């Protein structure tokens, strides 16, 4: 997902190229079909679809909701990575996503012992929430 309104942006962001809203391809039916084909071709190897960027929650919510609805039809866990708190995530995201990683990257809080749901998080302020368990 391209585009991040971070103000300020995270120091040492893992993907500063994604801050620009004008890069990448627009999500549409053709793009979804490409994703669907890849997931079907590698079905036995793919357990989840992870969405990060940029900032997922700085996007057009109508387009984001449509994308999540499409992806949900692929019967894979949907992960969203956001700098925002869970309380700031839109309702449709809570309903359609299986996991939501919250918390911006804060270099001063870097750590190597924040393992949650099989994902090593970069800083101690980050948390992963699982649908049905944590929200």
Model regions: which residues?
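Hydrophobic faces of well-ordered beta-strands that scaffold small-molecule active sites
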Residues: 49, 78-80, 102
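Canonical radical SAM enzyme core domain
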Residues: 20-36, 57-94
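Conserved glycine-rich "GG(E/T)P / GGGxP" loop and the immediately following alpha-helix
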Residues: 45-70, 116-118, 132
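Classical nucleotidyltransferase
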Residues: 88-135
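Flexible loop residues that form catalytic
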Residues: 18, 54, 104-105
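Canonical Radical SAM [4Fe-4S] cluster-binding loop centered on the CxxxCxxC motif
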Residues: 1-29
